[in-house]
Design a protein with these regions (language model features):
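Local beta-strand/beta-hairpin segments that build beta-sheet-rich folds
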Residues: 5-8
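Short beta-strand His + acidic residue motifs that chelate non-heme Fe in jelly-roll/DSBH
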Residues: 26-28, 46-47, 72-79
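Ligand-binding loop in jelly-roll beta-barrel domains
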Residues: 70-91
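Conserved short histidine dyad/triad with adjacent acidic residue
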Residues: 14-30, 49, 69
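Short acidic-glycine-tyrosine-enriched beta hairpin
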Residues: 51-69
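Short, flexible surface segments
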Residues: 22, 41, 61-62
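Catalytic phosphate/metal-binding cores of nucleic-acid and nucleotide-processing enzymes, i.e., regions
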Residues: 2, 12
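Short, conserved beta-strand element in jelly-roll/cupin
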Residues: 30-46
């Protein structure tokens, strides 16, 4: 299982660094808040949504992306090396 390190958690935001060893995942989860992800290195994540649809997402170090709340998925490290990103949630 991927590890999460909550760096900031206040009434407006939660900032979490997610770290994955090869093949580790977050487990299926639903996002309660809108959020931004900032990859800490180049790599790929395998995203499996609630109906089993699989997407391979190519990420670039430092290139952020935004998603709306309600996303329901499992995130898996699809690389042959450890991978991490910072997730910023807007409460």
């Amino acid at each position: 299982m991927a590890t999460s390190d909550i760096q900031i958690d206040n009434k407006r935001t939660r900032v979490t660094r997610w770290s994955f060893e090869v093949g580790e995942d977050t487990g299926q989860h639903i996002h309660e808040y809108d959020y931004v992800v900032v990859p800490m290195e180049d790599g790929q994540l395998k995203i499996v949504d609630q109906d089993g649809t699989v997407l391979i997402s190519d990420l670039i170090k430092g290139k952020s992306y935004y998603r709306n709340k309600g996303v329901n998925h499992n995130v898996i490290n699809h690389n042959d090396f450890p991978f991490s990103f910072v997730e910023i949630e807007f409460k």
